[in-house]
Amino acid sequence: MNVVIVADDGYIQHAGVMLTSLFETNKGCRIRVFLLTNGISDDNQRRLECLCKAYGNSIEICQPDSQLSQYCDIDKLNSSNWSKMIYYKLFMPHILPLEVERCLFLDVDMVVVDNLNELYNIPLNPNAIIAAVEDVISCLPRKD
């Protein structure tokens, strides 16, 4: 299973929690994680690598700015409100290795509560380039 996440040092802790929940709920599934980032510290990179290795999985750190320069001036996409990293997911076909035919993009500020194998293997139209689910919002009443 190929999983793509986007994070920088400010969200690495969130990424670690999400990845732990992913690995715990998908034991027995070999997971290859691609982290798209504009840079993380060596210490945080080691932490993520150790986490993935502890579960028998792998992580590839991708810093795609130079790859994307042939498609757009990525630095012009930066604003005071948004990091240019939010655009990385739009360019996944140009960032990921060619052998990656399918992947799940997961936000790092979530917790995976069930096995994702069924979702990952949903049959898609051969011409599909993207599939998405509707946003899911909990409508349960608040318990005070």
Segments (PLM) and residue ranges:
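Glycosyltransferase catalytic domains, chiefly GT-A lineage
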Residues: 1-144
